[in-house]
Amino acid sequence: MRILGIDPGTLVVGYGIIEAANDELTLVGFSSLTPPACAPIPQRLAYIYKGLVEVIELYQPDEVAVESPFADKNIKSALAIGKAQAVALLAAANHSLPVTEYSPACIKSRVAGSGNASKEQIQEMVRLLLNLAEIPQPNDAADALAVAICHHSQRAFTNIISQGDLT
């Protein structure tokens, strides 16, 4: 199962692709898309869409996992991230790929065992779970890999529950 994880944003979109075979995770690729910061939002979103389409066509994922926006105090920022998230959902839908969205707390819990884990703890767990020498850079790509790992973990848990094998 090849999973594309996406960490959406209007300034930087991180993406990471993992291959999951049984309990073994393998890094396939990762990077980020950085639209011109001075461009208007519609042009940035078009840049992100085009880039994600290229990623999907290059890596041929089976499923896509996207981090959902976190709305704390900065609603304007959450709305902007929501626009980038919608573009990611559209790119996946236009390629008939199943998409699952995960909250930041769910990703932290699945990857590091705590919904309150720090960004550094998540990135270190990504490094360990993918058996890497260094934490992937840029940070947005490491975050996207965490989204993909979260999706794999959730799928594995769902499979165990559906089989009734809780021993």
From Swiss-Prot:
Keyword RNA-binding in record: no
Catalysis performed (reactions): Endonucleolytic cleavage at a junction such as a reciprocal single-stranded crossover between two homologous DNA duplexes (Holliday junction)
Span of the signal peptide: none
Any single Gene Ontology cellular-component annotation: cytoplasm
PROSITE patterns in the cross-refs: RUVC
Keyword DNA damage: yes
Subcellular localization, as worded in the UniProt entry: Cytoplasm
Primary location: cytoplasm
Record-listed Mg(2+) 2 binding positions: E67
Keywords, comma-separated and alphabetical: Cytoplasm, DNA damage, DNA recombination, DNA repair, DNA-binding, Endonuclease, Hydrolase, Magnesium, Metal-binding, Nuclease
EC numbers for this chain: 3.1.21.10
Stored Gene3D superfamilies: Ribonuclease H-like superfamily/Ribonuclease H
Co-factor: note: Binds 2 Mg(2+) ion per subunit.
Record note on quaternary structure: Homodimer which binds Holliday junction (HJ) DNA. The HJ becomes 2-fold symmetrical on binding to RuvC with unstacked arms; it has a different conformation from HJ DNA in complex with RuvA. In the full resolvosome a probable DNA-RuvA(4)-RuvB(12)-RuvC(2) complex forms which resolves the HJ.
Protein purpose: The RuvA-RuvB-RuvC complex processes Holliday junction (HJ) DNA during genetic recombination and DNA repair. Endonuclease that resolves HJ intermediates. Cleaves cruciform DNA by making single-stranded nicks across the HJ at symmetrical positions within the homologous arms, yielding a 5'-phosphate and a 3'-hydroxyl group; requires a central core of homology in the junction. The consensus cleavage sequence is 5'-(A/T)TT(C/G)-3'. Cleavage occurs on the 3'-side of the TT dinucleotide at the point of strand exchange.
Family membership noted in the UniProt record: Belongs to the RuvC family.
Protein name per the record: Crossover junction endodeoxyribonuclease RuvC
Annotated gene: ruvC
